Amino acid sequence: MKHIRNFSIIAHIDHGKSTLSDRLIQVCGGLSNREMSAQVLDSMDLERERGITIKAQSVTLDYTAKDGETYQLNFIDTPGHVDFSYEVSRSLAACEGALLVVDAGQGVEAQTLANCYTAMEMDLEVVPILNKIDLPAADPERVAEEIEDIVGIDAIDATRCSAKTGLGVEDVLENIVAAIPPPEGDPEGPLQALIIDSWFDNYLGIVSLVRVKNGSLKKNAKIKMMSTGQVWNIDRLGIFTPKQIDTTELNTGEVGWVVCGIKDILGAPVGDTITTAKDGSETPLPGFKKVKPQVYAGLFPISSDDYENFRDALGKLSLNDASLFYEPESSTALGFGFRCGFLGMLHMEIIQERLEREYNLELITTAPTVVYEVETTRNGTVYVDSPSKLPAVNDIEVIGEPIARCNILVPSEYLGNVITLCIEKRGMQVDMIYHGNQVALTYDIPMSEVVLDFFDRLKSTSRGYASLDYNFQRYEPSNMVRVDVMINGERVDALAIITHKDHANGRGRDLVDKMKEFIPRQMFDIAIQAAIGGMIIARATVKQLRKNVIAKCYGGDISRKKKLLQKQKAGKKRMKQIGNVELPQEAFLAILHVGKK
């Protein structure tokens, strides 16, 4: 056991976590040069296309150190985006240490801080690594000072490396062996193993990634899931090198995968404890705290025949992504679907794309909303995650809007732009601290403004240098109203939005204008209106397509032309009474484009 080292690699987006993982695998001979590819751990097509890590991946490597001993390194490559911070905290729960990778050119950024604090809260040993020292813009001395100043950990002798060229990777490995403590646990005690992650395999059933805390897991042994009480037989178990390799047992302190032939999606929940069926442990390990979704949106299959497949797909995906929340929902415009909760907009995009790719579904997404706390005159407090669930205006005492605490790190030359943006988003300044050239800003901004397009706007106003980390702070009373959209006089529930009263007229106007761009012209006029209660605040008309009925009249009397035009008008009127308007997917997401030029 004293030769085992469990650690995670944490960093801000694009600071080189996955590339460093590749180098560690190569140096330790986990894969031959022929099998090696860039970002070998980003196994999903989506991850490779976007160049980001979405799922944490674990690898077991053997490393012979300079002291002649062979160490078993179990490490987990984690995502960097704020939307996937839950993946990071789960990965850290399985480790004794973390490599904090910092780009020697960019320096400390917001996610560096957030992930590092998560690791410190869990009492992990944090080892700073300065990456990308081969870049012309690299300034390791300045960045080491920044780490000490902003993060508050000792970084004078931080290991310097370049994951791209492989320079200094040996030093990183030596540092891991020296600085990260071996796991603690009782090899002779009753079995306790924590499920860090699960996913569904069509042939094997549920595959679970586990960390053995006490005791050992053996092939063909009978085990019990502590949350469900079900007993299973271990069919196969093993480690990732990153190939899936079978072994006969997993001992205390090791990380590996287990297959028990479980077909029920709820059979092996993430955060559950595995113990032996006979003489097992009585107490489960502390699991993970449940995360609350911040953004809700309706997902509906375009074809109603796909509803069953869609439900199964969501079940399998939620097994793999424990932060996804979903419940059935029906809409008059879109039929049956699900109301899904996500951690942020990127998370929502990724889930939708995974559902469409991995399960061949065609989906329509409604505009995302956050959760409002509504105090009603009759039913006490209700939480509203969809505009259609908002009670009638005369039943509402007060609407509480969720406020996010945003920590922004920005170089001082872009400070003015960022403050202007925060004020535009109804933000309140809480704190401002200068660290050399960097400024740490803390703002309280309404969550609805943050999740919509704040991150994109922040990046563009600071040329990509500002970085953001946010979390839910509290609910605050606010003057919110629901803006309904009517098409030819009919309310479309899936298009309603909740917005601040001061912004309602502008938002309504913009929304109607955007919808006009996206709805194709029909044979009759389409009136698009935005309304608050019974008051219409904006209108746009998509003009009808019409045939030139008087083209065949050359000379002759004007009354002949009038007669033909009147006849066409009567036909159009009749058509409008029975005609349906088909809305494309873009029309449902027009709200996302509101305010963008």
Curated annotation (Swiss-Prot):
It is a peripheral membrane protein. Keywords: Cell inner membrane, Cell membrane, GTP-binding, Hydrolase, Membrane, Nucleotide-binding, Protein biosynthesis. The keyword Cell membrane applies. It holds the Pfam family GTP_EFTU_D2. GO terms for biological process: positive regulation of translation. It catalyses: GTP + H2O = GDP + phosphate + H(+). Its EC number is 3.6.5.n1. Its main location: membrane. It is found in: Cell inner membrane. GO terms for cellular component: plasma membrane. Residues 2-184 form the tr-type G domain. GO terms for molecular function: GTP binding; GTPase activity; guanosine tetraphosphate binding; ribosome binding; translation elongation factor activity. GTP binds at residues 14-19, 131-134. SMART domains: EFG_C. Signal peptide: none annotated. Belongs to the TRAFAC class translation factor GTPase superfamily. Classic translation factor GTPase family. LepA subfamily. NCBIfam families: lepA, small_GTP. Required for accurate and efficient protein synthesis under certain stress conditions. May act as a fidelity factor of the translation reaction, by catalyzing a one-codon backward translocation of tRNAs on improperly translocated ribosomes. Back-translocation proceeds from a post-translocation (POST) complex to a pre-translocation (PRE) complex, thus giving elongation factor G a second chance to translocate the tRNAs correctly. Binds to ribosomes in a GTP-dependent manner. This is Elongation factor 4.
